[in-house]
Amino acid sequence: MLNNLTPSQQQYDRQVAYWLLLCAVVIFGMILLGGVTRLTDSGLSMVDWKPIKGIIPPITQADWQAMFAKYQQFPEYQKTNFTMTLEEFKPIFMYEYLHRMLGRFIGIIFVLPFLFFYFTKRIAHGLTPRLVVMLLLGGSQGLLGWYMVKSGLVDNPHVSQYRLTAHLGLAVFIYGFIVWTVLDLLAPKLSHPKH
């Protein structure tokens, strides 16, 4: 027989906190992968931004050739990597591809549980606006990432250090914002005795 008692808001807060903690861990991994992408000069290997259609990576040799041909039309290849072979291109492409896919994954693990918690009324009063701000910041981060990459697809094959700093800074801010919210949800609520 099912227990008809609903969990207390404290249990709901804990569920929301664990979900946000998962998001924070994945975002931390994203920041690390972004660093690897930067250090391996992989960020400009994907020269277009297709948030929906760009999910499937090159699979066949013809797919890889087409992707490499696109890359060859841009300054990074023409001025810096003009001796690069297709086999050398594949790893740098995959770093950037994984970075973008992890961004999509973060969006999914944020949005779907958010909708579940929202429609099942498990989000504490007053927390929804904070979660909506997190969602908007996450979307802005994706746009800022593309804005940063675009800066390196012009004559100078290097991303703008200002846009890079903004992209990293926003990632760290989002991470901190989520961790702060997790701690806020998990911290015992202090009750002040009445005098």
Give, region by region, the residue ranges found by the protein language model.
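Short aromatic-rich membrane-water interface segments that cap or initiate transmembrane helices
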Residues: 55-58, 89-101, 158-170
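Hydrophobic cores of alpha-helical transmembrane segments in multi-pass inner/ER membrane proteins
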Residues: 106-112, 169-185
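N-terminal signal-anchor transmembrane alpha helix
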Residues: 16-56
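Membrane-interfacial, low-structure loops and terminal tails that flank and connect transmembrane helices
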Residues: 1-12, 187-195
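Interfacial helix-loop-helix junctions of multi-pass membrane proteins
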Residues: 37-46, 143-164, 168
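Membrane-interfacial loop-to-transmembrane alpha-helix junctions, especially the N-terminal start
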Residues: 18, 125-138
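Individual transmembrane alpha-helix segments
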Residues: 69-108
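Membrane-interface helix-boundary motifs at transmembrane edges
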Residues: 120-128, 190-195
